Amino acid sequence: MAKWGEGDPRWIVEERADATNVNNWHWTERDASNWSTEKLKTLFLAVRVENEEGKCEVTEVNKLDGEASINNRKGKLIFFYEWTIKLNWTGTSKSGVQYKGHVEIPNLSDENSVDEVEISVSLAKDEPDTNLVALMKEDGVKLLREAVGIYISTLKTEFTQGMILPTVNGESVDPVGQPALKTETCKAKSAPSKSQAKPVGVKIPTCKITLKETFLTSPEELYRVFTTQELVQAFTHAPAALEADRGGKFHMVDGNVTGEFTDLVPEKHIAMKWRFKSWPEGHFATITLTFIDKNGETELCMEGRGIPAPEEERTRQGWQRYYFEGIKQTFGYGARLF
């Protein structure tokens, strides 16, 4: 745990604008233990991995001992969390044989980075050997570690609200300091599909783009990735908030992407109003995602209408890099496992 007066400068704020207790140490403490318990259970129980040997999933959280809290001392946020965790997992081979096992995480604490958290996987007593253990130790542990990272990230975003007041210059401090969406170039797989420029929304020239990508997962799982807050935060590596219902709002990638869901059909279709922060005020594109089952794989068809014409290539690159490649790298949906 960080020492008093030390820590990440992103969490340090200036003297308070209201001058309250400016020259004294002032404590504000928030207990995050109950929230952490539910958040960790949700994240761990969502872990599922699969390859040609079969599939594995976390089925039970049978021990979750510890506590979490946040302290604000004169503008410095100090996070404390310490957990000992035991999970049960079940593996099912392609032939239908089931295996039981355990996961132990003895040192999830603020004193360890995500990479330093120990995660051990084992078979239950008297279970025969199976190659599914290797699947769980490699891909399962990867997703468990990502779940730990999401927990830490959301702890530092959801529970800091209201704990730091505006600074003397009237500005608030961004407690996370995540990078904004960048505009590096990358080669998209699909060729441009332009429509004739036409005015829409706030009368600007617009165009249409289409992209197709194949993911090595089911439509059900890929749909969850786009509609579950924790999973969106995982593949964007930044805070996000979303309500996956018709009319539900979303914002992600440090507020650079915002919008509203207009239609959702689980495992089949998502339609949304969508915009970059840099676009003209009030202008949204219409994005449609169609999920097509391809015998264990999913073909995702993305169509974007009303894209500002000067933003066509940036939007295409953003979807290819931050959505498609981000999802594949985070969840392992881009390459077969042998």
UniProtKB/Swiss-Prot annotation:
SMART domains: Aha1_N. The modification Phosphoserine is found at residue 193. It holds the Pfam family AHSA1. There is a cross-link at residue 203 (Glycyl lysine isopeptide (Lys-Gly) (interchain with G-Cter in SUMO2)). Its main location: cytoplasm. Transmembrane segments: none annotated. It is found in: Cytoplasm, Cytosol; Endoplasmic reticulum. InterPro entries: Aha1 (IPR036338), AHSA1-like_N (IPR015310), ASHA1/2-like_C (IPR013538), START-like_dom_sf (IPR023393). GO terms for cellular component: cytoplasm; cytosol; endoplasmic reticulum. GO terms for molecular function: ATPase activator activity; Hsp90 protein binding; protein folding chaperone; protein-folding chaperone binding. The modification N6-acetyllysine is found at residues 3, 212. The modification Phosphotyrosine is found at residue 223. Keywords: Acetylation, Chaperone, Cytoplasm, Endoplasmic reticulum, Isopeptide bond, Phosphoprotein, Stress response, Ubl conjugation. Signal peptide: none annotated. The keyword Phosphoprotein applies. One of its GO terms (biological process) is maintenance of unfolded protein. Disulfide bonds: none annotated. There is a cross-link at residue 182 (Glycyl lysine isopeptide (Lys-Gly) (interchain with G-Cter in SUMO1)). Induction: By heat shock and treatment with the HSP90 inhibitor 17-demethoxygeldanamycin (17AAG). Phosphorylation at Tyr-223 enhances binding to chaperone HSP90AA1. Belongs to the AHA1 family. PANTHER family: ACTIVATOR OF 90 KDA HEAT SHOCK PROTEIN ATPASE HOMOLOG 1, HEAT SHOCK PROTEIN 90 HSP90 CO-CHAPERONE AHA-1. Interacts with HSPCA/HSP90. Interacts with HSP90AA1; the interaction activates HSP90AA1 ATPase activity. Interacts with HSP90AB1. Interacts with GCH1. Interacts with SRPK1. Interacts with FLCN. Acts as a co-chaperone of HSP90AA1. Activates the ATPase activity of HSP90AA1 leading to increase in its chaperone activity. Competes with the inhibitory co-chaperone FNIP1 for binding to HSP90AA1, thereby providing a reciprocal regulatory mechanism for chaperoning of client proteins. Competes with the inhibitory co-chaperone TSC1 for binding to HSP90AA1, thereby providing a reciprocal regulatory mechanism for chaperoning of client proteins. This is Activator of 90 kDa heat shock protein ATPase homolog 1. The lineage of its organism: Eukaryota, Metazoa, Chordata, Craniata, Vertebrata.
